[in-house]
Amino acid sequence: MTRIEEEVLAGVPVFPLPQVVLFPEVFLPLHIFEPRYRAMLTDCLDGDGALVIAQVDRESGRIADVAAVGVIVDHRPLPDGRSNIVVAGSARVRLDELVTEDLPRYPYKRARATRLDELDVSVADGDRAALVAAATMFVAEVKKHDPTFELQMPTQPTASALADICAFHLVVDSAVRQLILEELDPRIRVRMVMDQLAVQHGAMLREAKGTVLN
């Protein structure tokens, strides 16, 4: 994925979305329709294409401090001014503060952000294999209900990337996804994803058993 330069993070556009958590190494399709975000999209396309996708609480309006910065890699404009885009996740960031300068020029939120690098530690081969097994079993269970479901993986992803991809595509609870995003130790992150997939798999099995009994 494209590495975003530090100066870009000095005033990066922020797209707050409820229940959406972007991760590095994943692709997020979005539909842009609000006027302020159309303006944001225009500015992004005129610049380096970078923006932060941050989870926002529907009730309080609070934007998560930790988010992911990505780059627009596909843009499909529609005749009425709306657009479909795809954002490629690049890195974890911490939103240090919202930028308030020149507000009339920018109808959308911008922030000063700092890149968050994960710890330089190795994930045990056994843990990586266990995550692959947990994801494989969960996907197989999902496919019983939705035969069209597919989980696309890059060739030989690192354990860290594997955890992020599985969290993005397979973890249902956005609050749990946020916690996984915030964890900078890939060893812990791998276990968090495994544990959550086990919980979800068990819930699906219990639901299926209950359906049969009824």
Language-model features, listed with the residues they occupy:
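N-terminal low-complexity, acidic/polar interaction/targeting segments
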Residues: 1-214
